[in-house]
Regions:
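Conserved N-terminal segment of class I S-adenosyl-L-methionine
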Residues: 1-167, 176-182, 315-319, 326
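Conserved S-adenosyl-L-methionine
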Residues: 12-18, 236-247
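A short glycine-rich, Lys/Arg-flanked "PGG" loop and its adjoining helix->strand segment in the class I
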Residues: 179-194
Length: 327
């Protein structure tokens, strides 16, 4: 057995932790294999494709799940989504997105990426890949976004996209399907387009990251090194790669030049935009009484959660990468 990312042949193992889905029967007693060379990690034995399909159809979004969404009750996003905002604000630094170019989210979730695309991109045509009929109706009604069942359907219609977003979706792919999935992305990205990828920072070569509370329903785990190597050898050029996001351990915020430029613009918008002032006021009212997670309001009225999305530090909880097809 060789590592899909680097061809390494030396692996360590780690017990899989299933806190969120103990009654599904597919995430119990699993073992994670960790490539000692690059940090790419995967399950020693994958659930079958049918098991995964049934899980996402029946269990992932059901009531009581940590990932439950009732699309009949949630509404159109009225404020900012810090993660989606940061992903797209960074991505547009690397692409010339023209009016009516196409944006695709591979796993839109609550649809907030569509709201941020409408905010940051000029008249984008919005698309998603989604199976849930309630979600499909919600995206179309609130954001005029159209959905495909899968990548094969997109390829058959010959559609290309200027910006593709793969936010916290790649880790849900089966190892046996990973290389094929990446090859499909190459077929739908436009010649001058980009793909924005974000995954959890799970470099399990670092023993301190073994102290975690849950792995389910993730099937893959990435280090920044592994993510770069995986897509480089698959025919992509990596044009941006940073570890950022919420802190696992406290460190003073550190912004690179790209992130610093975006943060300065956002701060200026906060000072001069009535919409963002209202957004921050609403956040203060909602979260000031909470002391949980990493969501808090600093004395200057700027959310730490949004700043975290631009804070570069190897101990942060996410890896953000932007790629384009190699010429």
């Amino acid at each position: 057995m060789k590592c899909l990312s680097c061809d390494g042949e030396t692996f360590e193992t780690l017990d899989y932790i299933n806190r969120d889905f103990p009654n599904t029967g597919i995430f119990d007693e699993l073992i994670i294999r960790i490539c000692s060379n690059c940090g790419f990690s995967f399950l020693a034995t994958d659930p079958t494709s049918d098991q995964i399909d049934n899980f996402y159809t029946s269990d992932y979004r059901k009531k009581g799940s940590a990932y439950h969404l009732d699309f009949g009750k949630i509404g159109r996003l009225k404020n900012l989504d810090p993660r989606a905002f940061a992903q797209l604000a960074t991505g547009i630094s690397f692409v010339d997105f023209k009016p009516f170019d196409a944006f695709l989210d591979l796993g839109p979730g609550n649809g907030n990426s569509f709201a941020m695309a409408n905010l940051l991109l000029p008249n984008p045509r919005l698309y998603g890949v989604e199976l849930n009929s309630g979600a499909i109706d919600f995206y179309h009604a609130n954001y005029n976004a159209n959905c495909f069942e899968n990548l094969e359907k997109i390829i058959s219609e010959g559609k290309l996209f200027k910006v593709i977003l793969l936010s916290h979706s790649l880790e849900h792919i089966r190892k046996d399907d990973l290389i094929y999935f990446i090859s499909q992305i190459r077929k739908i990205i436009s010649e001058d387009g980009i793909c924005i990828i974000e995954v959890p920072n799970d470099d399990f070569r670092k023993k301190e990251l073994h102290a975690r509370s849950n792995d389910s329903p993730h099937l893959l785990f990435f280090s920044a090194e592994a993510l770069r190597k995986l897509f480089t050898r698959s025919g992509f050029e990596v044009i941006y790669l940073k570890v950022l996001g919420n802190p696992r351990f406290y460190n003073k915020p550190n912004f690179g030049p790209i992130e610093k430029n975006i943060v300065q613009k956002v701060k200026a918008a906060v000072l001069y935009s009535g919409i963002l002032k209202k957004f921050l006021k609403n956040l203060r009212r909602r979260f000031l009484h909470r002391v949980s997670g990493f969501i808090e309001i600093n004395p200057k009225g700027f959310t730490d959660n949004l700043l975290h999305q631009f804070t570069v530090d190897d101990s942060r909880d996410c890896i953000r990468m932007i790629i384009r097809s190699s010429k």
